[in-house]
């Protein structure tokens, strides 16, 4: 399945919630009618079955992290193999993706921009360039911007935007040095309460 390249707000409207696919901190409901589905007048949302609700939740999380369908299923399989709560394991794996960590640290304004920074070899982990967005960052790893990329205006703009967002407690960021430490794997209470990972587990358990 190819990566979606269309309007970002359309995806958020389809899921009925802000997926944080656009840069900035302004609430998405000030930009568009989030309660309406995509379309000139917004198609009336049908009443969903249990399966439909589970599918929508999976799509919402998958699109939030910018992961393709096959990748997402593989993350679920890995989460199910690990000890502990499968749903929480899934979120931890998604949060540990390098592109997501770059975004959380404020080096990219969006996850898509952060993914581009990684693929363009602008990101280092423990002093070595890593160009794979799905690379799993582990506790105590140091993530930094390469020297030649520190002057990019988009990186500076992203750091300014990040100052307006809530700072993740599981990360330690030095904006001046443009580097951060992945201190620990985030706990469920650290992450958005808007995600219902139990629905995703129910979907894949069928």
Swiss-Prot record:
Pfam families per record: Ribosomal_S4 (PF00163), S4 (PF01479)
Keywords: Ribonucleoprotein, Ribosomal protein, RNA-binding, rRNA-binding
Cited PROSITE patterns: RIBOSOMAL_S4, S4
Lineage top rank: taxon: Bacteria
Keyword 4Fe-4S: no
GO biological process, one term: ribosomal small subunit biogenesis
Gene3D superfamilies reported in the protein's UniProt record: Ribosomal Protein S4 Delta 41, Chain A, domain 1, RNA-binding S4 domain
SUPFAM superfamilies per UniProt: Alpha-L RNA-binding motif
GO cellular component terms, A-Z: small ribosomal subunit
Disulfide feature: none
Domain spans labelled S4 RNA-binding: 96-156
SMART domains: Ribosomal_S4, S4
Gene Ontology MF annotations: rRNA binding; structural constituent of ribosome
InterPro entries assigned: Ribosomal_uS4 (IPR022801), Ribosomal_uS4_bac-type (IPR005709), Ribosomal_uS4_CS (IPR018079), Ribosomal_uS4_N (IPR001912), S4_RNA-bd (IPR002942), S4_RNA-bd_sf (IPR036986)
Quaternary assembly: Part of the 30S ribosomal subunit. Contacts protein S5. The interaction surface between S4 and S5 is involved in control of translational fidelity.
Record-linked PANTHER family: 30S 40S RIBOSOMAL PROTEIN, SMALL RIBOSOMAL SUBUNIT PROTEIN US4M
Homology family: Belongs to the universal ribosomal protein uS4 family.
Function: One of the primary rRNA binding proteins, it binds directly to 16S rRNA where it nucleates assembly of the body of the 30S subunit. With S5 and S12 plays an important role in translational accuracy.
Name listed for the protein in its UniProt record: Small ribosomal subunit protein uS4
Species the sequence originates in: Erwinia tasmaniensis (strain DSM 17950 / CFBP 7177 / CIP 109463 / NCPPB 4357 / Et1/99)
């Amino acid at each position: 399945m190819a990566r979606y390249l269309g309007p970002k707000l359309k995806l958020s409207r389809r899921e009925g919630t802000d997926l944080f696919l656009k840069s900035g901190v302004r609430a998405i409901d000030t930009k568009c009618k989030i309660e309406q589905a995509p379309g000139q007048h917004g198609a009336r949302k049908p009443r969903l079955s249990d399966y439909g609700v589970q599918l929508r939740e999976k799509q919402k999380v998958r699109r939030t992290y910018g992961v393709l369908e096959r990748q997402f299923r593989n993350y679920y399989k890995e989460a199910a193999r690990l000890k502990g709560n499968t749903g929480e394991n899934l979120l931890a794996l998604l949060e540990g993706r390098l592109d997501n960590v770059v975004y959380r640290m404020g080096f990219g304004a969006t996850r898509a921009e952060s993914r581009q920074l990684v693929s363009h070899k602008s990101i280092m982990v423990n002093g070595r360039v890593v160009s794979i967005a799905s690379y799993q960052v582990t506790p105590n790893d140091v993530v930094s911007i390469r020297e030649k990329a520190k002057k990019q205006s988009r990186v500076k703009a992203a750091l300014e935007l990040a100052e307006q967002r809530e700072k993740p407690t599981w990360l330690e960021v030095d904006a001046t040095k443009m580097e951060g430490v992945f201190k620990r794997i985030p706990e469920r209470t650290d992450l958005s309460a808007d995600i219902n990972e139990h629905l995703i587990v129910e979907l894949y358990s069928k």
